[in-house]
Structure formats: C-alpha cells, structure tokens
Amino acid sequence: MNHMDPNLPRAASLADLVDVTGLSRNVRRILEDVLEGREASEADGVALFAAAGRDIAAIVAVADHLRERVNGDRVSFVVNRNINFTNVCYMGCRFCGFAKRSDEEGAEWLSLDQIVGRASEAWSRGATEVCIQGGLHPKMEGTYYRDIVLALKAELPDMHIHAYSPFEIWYGASKRRMSYEDYIADLMECGLGTIPGTAAEILDTDIRKQLTKNKLSAERWVEIIRAAHSVGMKTTATIMYGHIDGPETWAAHICLLR
C-alpha cells in the first residue's frame, strides 16, 4: 500500500538525495524501491534496522525526503498533561519502576476531585489534552474509568481526553463483563477522545512472556485496538525496544501495526 500522495513530486533517483558510493547493495535496492512508491517488506525493515556506516545516512536522507513529500515542513504539537491516577499494580512487569503494592510507601490512588484538579491546573496553563493512565488497582470498580471521563468533561468540556491503554480497557471490560466494542463505545459516549496504544512493548509473544508474563498477549492487544477502530475510536501505538529484542522483532512489530 502506498500512503503517499501520487501528485507530490518524486525524487528522480536515490542519487539525487545522497552519494550512493559505498552503499550496500541491499539497502540501496530497498531505498530505491520506496522512493518509487513500493512499500518496504518486513525483511526490508530488518535490513534497514541492522544497517551501519554510510547506509544509515542514506536511510535518514530518504526518510526525511518521504516525510517532506507527505507533510512538507509543517510541525504540530499538543500541550498535554499526564495524570497517573494510581501506581498500585500487581502485574509484575519486570521492567516497571512505577508499580507499588497498596500498603507500600509511596502508593497513591487519586480521587476524582484530585484528577479534575490536576486537569484544571493544566487547562489554566494552556493544555488542551490530558493523558490518563494508571496501574490496575485490585479494588477498582469497573465503572471507574467512565467516572473519570464524566468528571473531567463536567468540569472541562473542551479538554481532549486521551486515556486508557488496551490493558486498562481489558481490565475495565472484564470487570463489567462487556465486550471490548461495547465498553469502548460507552467510554466514547462519556467523552473519551482517543486511546493511547501503550502496553504494546514489543508485539512478540515470546518476548512478552519474558518481560510481562501477566500482561496482555500480543494477540489480545491487537484485538482490543481493532475493537476500538471498529467503533470509530482512534488510537496511537507504541513500541518499547532496547531490552531483549532486536531488528527482527522491531520490524515484525511495525509490520503488524501497519
């Protein structure tokens, strides 16, 4: 699939962008293909992630050219405040430096008033969005996520709410015994704007078992994201790399998202 506007100007060749002397044959072939509008394969992605030396500069130049073709030099940003409403969680992800047990020093669980207060403070400072996430508190009611959204919208109707990872959607839907589609649709009706595609880490089953044995499987994460899209909810998607992963799993992760 070619996501670029065919009416935008194309580079005549890779040589128009970089000095091709010394480029590896495979990387040169991949870059020439994408400049002609062909989508890189998963194997191509592995090769690009493993690139070194002069190949890296060529990859950067082509990537920048493709970005400019699609979006010009327009840059945008959002003034956002992250509000983590609880750090109490018992999932035991090996990389997490955030989670506390409920009886541990530093454990917290914000009230609705505290969450709204922090969002109001952000609004007064120019924020137009809040990102709301937290641990999976064992005493949390299934309606708590919708209660947060309703409280925020009652006080700040124009604030965009970007909230609840697929893991949290799974948790809330499970507690309310609802399908993911129905649960997300209910949150949308309450005022949820978008869902952060966090908790993705690396979408590889073997790696996830080692890092996050109690977390969502890659298949379940994808199922929930697809459920969100099916009811008209937009999401982001993240990647967490640099631990026990590598070029093969990075490329597979991105191709799965694509």
List each language-model region with its residue ranges.
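N-proximal short alpha-helices
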Residues: 14, 18-21, 29-32, 88, ...
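Bulky hydrophobic/aromatic packing residues
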Residues: 4, 9-13, 26, 49, ...
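Conserved Radical SAM active-site core
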Residues: 41, 100-257
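N-terminal pre-triad scaffold of radical SAM enzymes
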Residues: 58-102, 107-133
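Flexible, acidic/Gly-rich N-terminal and inter-domain linker regions that tether
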Residues: 1-82, 86
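Flexible, active-site-adjacent loop/turn segments at secondary-structure boundaries
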Residues: 47, 73, 81-83, 87, ...
